[in-house]
């Protein structure tokens, strides 16, 4: 491949920060919706599954509707991934946030079972289907867009900002539900209070749409289109054939990221209440505080990944959880509240290493002309199989074995596999150009360096197989 210095991408670091905010809004909205739904399952069950007498079964049906969203994510990943690789990243990100906002608003407006009968749960299910479908193209698109718009030397530190949106969305949901339950009676919450957060989600979506409409297309995508007119000539089977190793590493990385993520954010609150016997308010405050502390930790580890390489930060997380997961769950069974807090915050500490590195690292595993669709499909299949099922698997393990430490064994096993795969198969790409692309630089000094060292600028040429 001939080197053309004119194709080196000069990017503005300040604009890159704005792209993080605009794309992070989508993450915030996704997790705000997830958090609100999780916190209001009892009210949703009472409104949409009222003929069911058992509260436990109503809750199961409510969670089943939530699980449907995960099953639709891979389909959304395929559709939006193909569109994103062919027509651009921006068009998808603009579309997904509209669909997400609409589905969230719909849930808040739906009549109850007592008003329209069986249509109520059916419409709830359809709203969750739309949410899952749109989310399937959202996160992979956000990661891709930020990675392609950031200077290579700051890709992880800027990418970690996406997870700030994730954490902020969940924190906002927790705080809003806490305020509503404080100011409203239980009857008012069951009647109309639970709907308020879903209705307010519309404004978050409109704000995100406003920001995203002002975005420009990523420089990497524009450069790729300009230099490779016949770029979209490979199908999924060929992608798997040529890049199965990269797909496998990405799949495993998403597994250990999401199993840890859902273990801490989705399962741990239930574990603390049902097994450890903490009250709901204390549990909510603890989990919210953990996520708040993870925000500066994620930013710190993102900067560290740019300096020492994301592979080493991955290994800090997987290695740490290999050693600490069982200890952490043992600490949760302590009679000391302080010791319990240490166990929870320890899990959050190691999770923050993933929050910091995943957004900036996963897009680097694939070439520009196949990046969106391959990342989107791989990410969403992995999340659907392992991420969304984590609370269910953890609950089943405790019930089946009778061992309250069973979830820790599961987390340890996943972490060991992740540690081995990253150690032996992952190549650190921190500071390097994205595969299939010329370098992204934000100063003339870096540009001059790559002009003098073209082989380092196009380090990926020898690896490309299609």
Curated annotation (Swiss-Prot):
Gene3D superfamilies: MFS general substrate transporter like domains
Protein origin, superkingdom: Bacteria
Bilayer topology: Multi-pass membrane protein
Main subcellular location of this protein, as a coarse class: membrane
Keyword Aminoacyl-tRNA synthetase set for record: no
GO cellular component: plasma membrane
This protein's UniProt keywords: Cell membrane, Membrane, Symport, Transmembrane, Transmembrane helix, Transport
A single GO molecular function term of this UniProt record: symporter activity
InterPro entries: H+-coupled_symporters, MFS, MFS_dom, MFS_trans_sf, Sugar_transporter_CS
Disulfide bridges in this chain: none
Protein's cellular compartments: Cell membrane
Keyword Iron: no
Annotated transmembrane regions: 20-42, 63-83, 91-111, 116-136, 164-184, 191-211, 247-267, 285-305, 313-332, 337-356, 379-399, 405-425
Similarity section: Belongs to the major facilitator superfamily. Metabolite:H+ Symporter (MHS) family (TC 2.A.1.6) family.
Entry-linked PANTHER family: ALPHA-KETOGLUTARATE PERMEASE (PTHR43528:SF1)
Its biological purpose: May be a proton symporter involved in the uptake of osmolytes such as proline and glycine betaine.
Protein name per Swiss-Prot or TrEMBL: Putative proline/betaine transporter
The organism of origin for this protein: Staphylococcus aureus (strain MRSA252)
Gene this protein is translated from: proP
